Amino acid sequence: MTTMTFRRRAKSFIMITCLLFGVVVQAQQHDDNQDLRAKLFSQVLSDYKDVRECLEQEEGGLRKAQEDMNVEEHDLNRDGVNEYEVELSGPCTCGMVNCSIYIYRKTGPGFESILDDASGFGVELLKTSTNGYRDLLVTARDTAATQGQMTYKFDGMQYREAKNMLVQLETGESKPASRRLQFKRGASEATVNGRVSIALPDTYLVGARAGQTMTIKLTAPRKTVRFLLMSPSTRSLVADNARDWTGVLAETGDYTIIIDSDARNSTYTMTVSIK
């Protein structure tokens, strides 16, 4: 055997060995990835029994749900170990656009949920951090003209919602998705002024007890400005296009007042009393 022939055979052997090694590595990575997906899927089903029961009734059942599951890896606390963003598709966890978003971190042999109350169509990692973990921005469809942008910050144990903004897509105008109406100490009445536009309402939360009497008076230069009042159980309490309302409350909790308009930049003044 000549030296040149030996070298050719040696190179061929090395190339074949490298190719076989690559195939083995890829197969191992695929197996590891499938094992990870199976464990994360099982964790979601264990944490959310209602989701499991719903998925079992869907066409294809749990097998199809696991196949369609999307998993993204993020190193949220920069420790070299990834956390996992998990999204399931289908009506059990999604609306028309928004889907439930879960984030897990590895803990011993299993996984621990660190974000479990988010819903939207994407997670963005912000440059800022809180308690060592990257802040998160979840974007969600609100209406055809608006979207919600929720900022989540880590409190040392879990991600908690820190800010919830409503954004008008055409104009870029934004405002808090809701605000709590504050009464001064000892006062039973509060007045607020604001400005609303098409698809960009003002939403107020008012805490009250069953048996109390609530009165709402709304004044505005434009007749297109009106309000909607909902009970803690989301039952509507006023007729359309209301400007004032008085009633005895049947529930204890947060009542929601939504002020909107069919015109742009509509100003208003609202007075709420609870006695």
Report residues per predicted region.
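Extracellular beta-rich ligand/substrate-recognition surface
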Residues: 58-66, 191-200, 237-238
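Edge beta-strands of jelly-roll/beta-sandwich modules across compartments, strongly enriched
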Residues: 263-275
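Non-catalytic extracellular/lumenal accessory regions of secreted precursors
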Residues: 173-203, 211, 275
